[in-house]
Amino acid sequence: RLLRGRLESLIPAAYGKLARLAADFRSRVQHAVPEARRRAFWEDALQGAVAEDVLAGREAEGRARLEALLEAAGHAPDDAPGEVYLVGGGPGDPELLTFRALRLMQQADVVVYDRLISDGVLALVRRDAERIYVGKARAEHTLPQEEINALLVRLARAGRRVLRLKGGDPFIFGRGGEEIDTLMAEGIPFQVVPGITAASGCAAYAGIPLTHRDHAQSVTFVTGHPKRDGDLRLNWPALAMPNQTLVFYMGVHGIQAIRAGLLDHGMPPDTPVAIVERGTQPDMRTHVSTLAEVCALVERTEISPPALLIIGGVVTLRGRLDWRGQAAQRQAG
């Protein structure tokens, strides 16, 4: 009784009118809309302007809108493509997802996801959506990027709503631009939803502001993933300049080259360095060292990917700004 009362207080009574309207159209939709597109039709109808009209008491307008949607669906070609949602899944904590990301995750027919997607984020995808894992660990891609691009096109051409779920933000070292370039060339509809990039999420959870008036007037995001020959080919003189913060994505594997490049171009050996491991997730760890000693830290510490390097004076602020560590101490005390 308590649960029923709670639900009745949360669900507007007008939803009954919306349900009756859907029932009136059910058999017509079954005849006019192919089965592969039927769920998408109802979701578009019942989450958009039709629902808004009915819930606002404009039942006649809602019925007219649904008639128009059904008419358009009946004239759509059978081979019309579906749509691809390129969604940033953030750094790992599912509570950092955007509202739009969560909505599209619940609408998708199939999800294509990478290694960097946490279990907590993946659990929020529609339960009956097909799941396709494409890997993309360092040097161990379950599918090469070109095959991932082709997979997205193939799934969308089958009329499916494809969730391309990527860790962090798809446009920051996520190769999202390459994927939508292919979709554009193939005439596949798509939309892009940004996510919180690892630099922002990891730094915030570690208590390290990326900029600070006393320490850094700029921040630079850098890929730490070396080329096949082991060379990073970066602008080391610019990166070694003072009063800035450097964030290296995928930097642990190339830590020796990063250390050498910065030291060789004048960065002080005592420059603070933080390695944030599995940032924003329950098993997150933060290791603090200096540029001179960071390689030794990596050698003696088993660091699990994903891990992020933060280099600069802002790292010294962690001692007093580690809000999560302080909260844990208060709870323990």
State each model region's role.
Residues R4-L7, F99-Q107, V125-E130, E178-T182, ...:
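Short, solvent-exposed amphipathic alpha-helical segments in soluble enzyme
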Residues R20-D78, G82-V84, A158-V162, A216-S218, ...:
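A contiguous loop/helix-start segment that scaffolds small-molecule binding in enzyme catalytic cores
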